[in-house]
């Protein structure tokens, strides 16, 4: 069995002075191993996974190394790989490692408490392992939830419950420490002299914040201890500046603005590490509060987004979340220059600009900050007065704050395509599609070492190209994913076929004249109708993905229409082009420029074939729903609303005796709640604050449409996020 604190041999026959010296070595060894773990994870965030794993392997072989944090670091690396790709073997490998880290953390926590091992001047013995335990639990539980097994999901909820309970206790201590730090207590330097280890030699006096007590007279002059303490300080300073993994200090690359053509900030020449970070913060203390803020924050946000039925059950046992509190904690974690800050930033990027549209840019309802702040004050003893507090308006639209955080990550990790990709996505979210594409094209995807990031880059670029109606390149990217990613070959193939279908239609309308009409036709037919044969091959789940089920249903619809109309050409059985549906799922209508929207409108209204001319009610519903959104984005909200009210919604529900009754429809399950959601958005756009009660009614209708349906997670979370925002504004 490994010895967490046996770094420097047994205490068997030691004198009190020797015991004190051994204890100090153990404290420093722990801080050293945590710095090694943080460095290894930073290598991964800079697209240098092999270097990070090799560093961990070397550290694991050292006698007396802290195997707990090293195992967790390996688990975090594998978790990042798994959640970027969702591939079977990587999910399994990460789950096994995190399970080990979970067990080791619990044993280390108990050992530290039993031996009263103090490695922090702020937190009780064992706290840092309580954090590694909750982090392991949280990440492990998320992987179990992704498995879509009922048994694994039940186990995951138990893990989350344990993590939640422990994090609540940790957060009490963290908040107490924060209040103490911001009170009229002694300055950090004075406090350091009172509670930290001070070394004195002929040449220097050095205070180590990593030693949470005064040193004995012998240890104060111990050159080996001094050398070890200075080494840890140097490691930490290198990490804070971004120079620890072989890059030059990050502030030399820091920019003020997004985009390929921007240059480093003029202020970067005058920048120093002390401008951003507390240099007198111990490594263990930093890990504790950044890890606690991140994990508890993520838990709060995830719980707040759960469907009402599940949320109600969990709240009965005290398992509930506050989105605002959770977001504030995640934002607080991003202020730290370690892996917790980076994971927090990735989470925020997904929240603000991901496919689930938790913060739909069109639903820009100003928050009722007074109510939420009053509630928060009552919970946190006036935490709104603490430095860095973010009010509700800032949490809803962080704007430049999120942009600056991303630019710092880009400067810290210049070799990583992951952060470049997030910058490109942010540009696209701002409507700067061409700038986004230029940034993506600035890197050779074959130079990306991390295969999972490479596949993400190619897929996101394909989505962007679809929004720009550049379907040739989009199809090429999607087909190339068959050799890169094992996620869903069926969806990649179908999506590429839809791109070729749209190109074929554009040639028929005279909008594209490249002499490849027959090629587009043949490729569209081949890829769309062959895609179902790839289902079940190279997917990470035992069940088909939601978008796989969407694809399978659509192809079956096309086949049924072909038989119904007795058509020779399969492509003539496709009414509304499915590429427009896929664009909706990936927030395309909010990102398209005016010219792109005009072309979308033209393709939805001017193209004709036998399936379209048959005016099938279900296909007309899809076409008119997407057309109404296009009109709204083009500034013609009144016309879009009329289309929705007169043609789309009467096919979805009716009012009987004052109660909403839904038509039982299964042809396109995602579209019906989505139409009700979009009706609420129309209400907001045309009525403003005076229409909030009506908005709420439409969102409740959307939420109550069905308990489960195709793409219910994607659509349902968007609905719940909007409903929470409306109810907050009405409070």
From Swiss-Prot:
Keywords: Cytoplasm, Nucleus, Phosphoprotein. It is found in: Cytoplasm; Nucleus. Present with 4980 molecules/cell in log phase SD medium. It comes from Saccharomyces cerevisiae (strain ATCC 204508 / S288c). Residues 1-26 are annotated as: Disordered. Pfam families: Iml2-TPR_39. This is Inclusion body clearance protein IML2. The modification Phosphothreonine is found at residue 380. The keyword Secreted does not apply. Belongs to the IML2 family. Interacts with lipid droplet proteins PET10 and PDR16. GO terms for biological process: cellular response to misfolded protein. The keyword Phosphoprotein applies. Residues 10-26 have a biased composition (Polar residues). GO terms for cellular component: cytoplasm; mitochondrial outer membrane; mitochondrion; nucleus. Inclusion body (IB) resident protein that interacts strongly with lipid droplet (LD) proteins. Involved in LD-mediated IB clearing after protein folding stress, probably by enabling access to the IBs of an LD-stored soluble sterol derivative that acts as a chaperone in inclusion clearing. The modification Phosphoserine is found at residues 265, 268, 378, 383, 392.
